[in-house]
Protein backbone atom coordinates (compact mmCIF):
# COMPACT_ATOMS: atom_id res chain seq x y z
CA UNK A 1 0.00 0.00 0.00
CA UNK A 2 2.87 2.37 0.79
CA UNK A 3 4.32 1.76 -2.68
CA UNK A 4 0.96 2.57 -4.27
CA UNK A 5 0.63 5.78 -2.30
CA UNK A 6 4.20 6.75 -3.18
CA UNK A 7 3.59 6.13 -6.90
CA UNK A 8 0.30 8.02 -6.85
CA UNK A 9 1.88 10.91 -4.95
CA UNK A 10 4.79 11.02 -7.37
CA UNK A 11 2.40 11.03 -10.32
CA UNK A 12 0.41 13.91 -8.82
CA UNK A 13 3.57 15.93 -8.13
CA UNK A 14 4.82 15.31 -11.65
CA UNK A 15 1.50 16.43 -13.14
CA UNK A 16 1.62 19.62 -11.07
CA UNK A 17 5.17 20.35 -12.23
CA UNK A 18 4.21 19.76 -15.86
CA UNK A 19 1.26 22.15 -15.57
CA UNK A 20 -1.29 19.36 -15.83
CA UNK A 21 -2.62 19.75 -12.30
CA UNK A 22 -3.80 22.50 -10.04
CA UNK A 23 -1.74 24.15 -7.36
CA UNK A 24 -2.54 26.23 -4.33
CA UNK A 25 -2.53 29.99 -4.33
CA UNK A 26 -0.92 31.61 -1.30
CA UNK A 27 -3.93 33.89 -0.83
CA UNK A 28 -6.46 31.06 -1.07
CA UNK A 29 -8.42 32.71 -3.87
CA UNK A 30 -8.78 32.04 -7.57
CA UNK A 31 -5.50 32.88 -9.27
CA UNK A 32 -7.09 34.56 -12.27
CA UNK A 33 -9.20 37.60 -11.52
CA UNK A 34 -11.83 39.07 -13.78
CA UNK A 35 -14.25 37.47 -16.18
CA UNK A 36 -12.71 34.23 -17.42
CA UNK A 37 -14.37 30.95 -18.27
CA UNK A 38 -13.06 27.98 -16.34
CA UNK A 39 -11.95 26.41 -19.62
CA UNK A 40 -9.78 29.45 -20.43
CA UNK A 41 -8.20 29.37 -16.99
CA UNK A 42 -7.62 25.61 -17.14
CA UNK A 43 -5.93 25.94 -20.54
CA UNK A 44 -3.70 28.69 -19.17
CA UNK A 45 -2.70 26.53 -16.20
CA UNK A 46 -4.71 28.60 -13.70
CA UNK A 47 -5.88 27.58 -10.27
CA UNK A 48 -9.14 27.88 -8.41
CA UNK A 49 -8.62 26.99 -4.78
CA UNK A 50 -10.23 28.40 -1.69
CA UNK A 51 -9.31 28.88 1.91
CA UNK A 52 -9.50 26.34 4.71
CA UNK A 53 -12.47 28.22 6.21
CA UNK A 54 -15.55 26.55 4.66
CA UNK A 55 -18.02 29.39 5.31
CA UNK A 56 -15.73 32.08 3.91
CA UNK A 57 -15.05 29.87 0.90
CA UNK A 58 -18.77 29.29 0.36
CA UNK A 59 -19.60 33.01 0.57
CA UNK A 60 -16.83 33.88 -1.88
CA UNK A 61 -17.85 31.09 -4.27
CA UNK A 62 -21.48 32.16 -4.36
CA UNK A 63 -20.77 35.88 -4.67
CA UNK A 64 -18.30 35.61 -7.56
CA UNK A 65 -18.86 34.61 -11.17
CA UNK A 66 -19.52 30.99 -12.11
CA UNK A 67 -16.17 29.20 -11.91
CA UNK A 68 -14.39 25.96 -11.12
CA UNK A 69 -13.41 25.29 -7.48
CA UNK A 70 -11.37 22.45 -5.95
CA UNK A 71 -11.48 20.51 -2.70
CA UNK A 72 -8.96 17.91 -1.56
CA UNK A 73 -10.98 15.13 0.07
CA UNK A 74 -10.46 11.62 1.28
CA UNK A 75 -12.25 9.05 -0.87
CA UNK A 76 -14.51 8.23 2.09
CA UNK A 77 -15.66 11.88 2.25
CA UNK A 78 -17.14 11.51 -1.24
CA UNK A 79 -19.78 9.26 0.32
CA UNK A 80 -19.83 6.75 -2.53
CA UNK A 81 -19.05 3.65 -0.43
CA UNK A 82 -15.38 3.14 -1.33
CA UNK A 83 -12.84 2.17 1.34
CA UNK A 84 -9.59 4.03 0.79
CA UNK A 85 -7.21 6.31 2.65
CA UNK A 86 -6.34 8.08 -0.61
CA UNK A 87 -6.98 11.78 -1.16
CA UNK A 88 -8.52 13.00 -4.41
CA UNK A 89 -9.12 16.44 -5.88
CA UNK A 90 -12.84 17.01 -6.30
CA UNK A 91 -13.69 19.91 -8.61
CA UNK A 92 -17.10 21.55 -8.63
CA UNK A 93 -18.83 24.65 -10.00
CA UNK A 94 -20.10 27.54 -7.92
CA UNK A 95 -20.90 31.19 -8.47
CA UNK A 96 -23.49 33.51 -9.85
CA UNK A 97 -24.76 33.66 -13.40
CA UNK A 98 -26.00 36.75 -15.24
CA UNK A 99 -29.62 36.81 -16.32
CA UNK A 100 -28.63 37.95 -19.82
CA UNK A 101 -30.61 36.46 -22.68
CA UNK A 102 -27.96 34.95 -24.97
CA UNK A 103 -30.16 32.26 -26.50
CA UNK A 104 -33.75 31.95 -27.67
CA UNK A 105 -34.40 29.96 -24.49
CA UNK A 106 -32.95 32.81 -22.44
CA UNK A 107 -35.12 35.39 -24.21
CA UNK A 108 -38.27 33.35 -23.67
CA UNK A 109 -37.39 32.61 -20.04
CA UNK A 110 -36.70 36.29 -19.28
CA UNK A 111 -40.07 37.26 -20.75
CA UNK A 112 -41.92 34.55 -18.78
CA UNK A 113 -40.14 35.56 -15.58
CA UNK A 114 -41.16 39.18 -16.17
CA UNK A 115 -44.77 38.01 -16.40
CA UNK A 116 -44.42 35.96 -13.20
CA UNK A 117 -45.08 32.70 -15.09
CA UNK A 118 -41.61 31.17 -14.66
CA UNK A 119 -39.24 31.09 -11.71
CA UNK A 120 -35.50 30.69 -11.31
CA UNK A 121 -32.75 31.70 -13.64
CA UNK A 122 -29.46 30.54 -15.09
CA UNK A 123 -27.41 28.34 -12.77
CA UNK A 124 -23.71 27.57 -12.52
CA UNK A 125 -23.07 23.96 -13.47
CA UNK A 126 -20.43 21.68 -14.98
CA UNK A 127 -20.23 21.71 -18.76
CA UNK A 128 -17.56 19.00 -18.90
CA UNK A 129 -16.45 16.27 -16.48
CA UNK A 130 -13.30 14.23 -15.79
CA UNK A 131 -12.82 10.79 -14.31
CA UNK A 132 -11.09 10.30 -10.95
CA UNK A 133 -8.95 7.23 -10.18
CA UNK A 134 -7.60 6.05 -6.83
CA UNK A 135 -6.17 2.97 -5.13
CA UNK A 136 -8.61 1.33 -2.72
CA UNK A 137 -7.76 -0.46 0.55
CA UNK A 138 -7.50 -3.80 -1.30
CA UNK A 139 -4.81 -2.36 -3.62
CA UNK A 140 -7.13 -2.21 -6.63
CA UNK A 141 -7.45 0.80 -8.88
CA UNK A 142 -10.93 2.26 -8.94
CA UNK A 143 -12.03 4.66 -11.66
CA UNK A 144 -15.05 6.87 -11.08
CA UNK A 145 -16.28 8.17 -14.44
CA UNK A 146 -17.39 11.80 -14.67
CA UNK A 147 -16.92 12.43 -10.94
CA UNK A 148 -15.19 15.79 -11.09
CA UNK A 149 -16.12 18.92 -13.02
CA UNK A 150 -13.61 20.00 -15.68
CA UNK A 151 -15.32 23.19 -16.88
CA UNK A 152 -18.23 25.35 -15.74
CA UNK A 153 -20.83 27.47 -17.41
CA UNK A 154 -24.19 29.09 -16.86
CA UNK A 155 -27.20 27.15 -18.06
CA UNK A 156 -30.93 27.25 -17.66
UniProtKB/Swiss-Prot annotation:
<dbReference type="GO" id="GO:0030116">
    <property type="term" value="F:glial cell-derived neurotrophic factor receptor binding"/>
</dbReference>
<dbReference type="GO" id="GO:0007399">
    <property type="term" value="P:nervous system development"/>
</dbReference>
<feature type="signal peptide">
    <location>
        <begin position="1"/>
        <end position="21"/>
    </location>
</feature>
<keyword id="KW-0732">Signal</keyword>
<feature type="disulfide bond">
    <location>
        <begin position="93"/>
        <end position="152"/>
    </location>
</feature>
<dbReference type="GO" id="GO:0005576">
    <property type="term" value="C:extracellular region"/>
</dbReference>
<dbReference type="GO" id="GO:0035860">
    <property type="term" value="P:glial cell-derived neurotrophic factor receptor signaling pathway"/>
</dbReference>
<keyword id="KW-1015">Disulfide bond</keyword>
<comment type="function">
    <text>Growth factor that exhibits neurotrophic activity on mesencephalic dopaminergic and motor neurons. Acts by binding to its coreceptor, GFRA4, leading to autophosphorylation and activation of the RET receptor.</text>
</comment>
<feature type="disulfide bond">
    <location>
        <begin position="97"/>
        <end position="154"/>
    </location>
</feature>
<keyword id="KW-0964">Secreted</keyword>
<dbReference type="GO" id="GO:0005102">
    <property type="term" value="F:signaling receptor binding"/>
</dbReference>
<dbReference type="GO" id="GO:0007417">
    <property type="term" value="P:central nervous system development"/>
</dbReference>
<comment type="similarity">
    <text>Belongs to the TGF-beta family. GDNF subfamily.</text>
</comment>
<comment type="subunit">
    <text>Homodimer; disulfide-linked. Interacts with GFRA4 coreceptor and RET: forms a 2:2:2 ternary complex composed of PSPN ligand, GFRA4 and RET receptor.</text>
</comment>
<dbReference type="GO" id="GO:0007422">
    <property type="term" value="P:peripheral nervous system development"/>
</dbReference>
<dbReference type="GO" id="GO:0005615">
    <property type="term" value="C:extracellular space"/>
</dbReference>
<dbReference type="GO" id="GO:0030971">
    <property type="term" value="F:receptor tyrosine kinase binding"/>
</dbReference>
<protein>
    <recommendedName>
        <fullName>Persephin</fullName>
    </recommendedName>
</protein>
<dbReference type="InterPro" id="IPR001839">
    <property type="entry name" value="TGF-b_C"/>
</dbReference>
<dbReference type="InterPro" id="IPR029034">
    <property type="entry name" value="Cystine-knot_cytokine"/>
</dbReference>
<feature type="disulfide bond">
    <location>
        <begin position="66"/>
        <end position="124"/>
    </location>
</feature>
<keyword id="KW-0339">Growth factor</keyword>
<dbReference type="GO" id="GO:0008083">
    <property type="term" value="F:growth factor activity"/>
</dbReference>
<dbReference type="Pfam" id="PF00019">
    <property type="entry name" value="TGF_beta"/>
</dbReference>
<dbReference type="InterPro" id="IPR043401">
    <property type="entry name" value="GDNF_fam"/>
</dbReference>
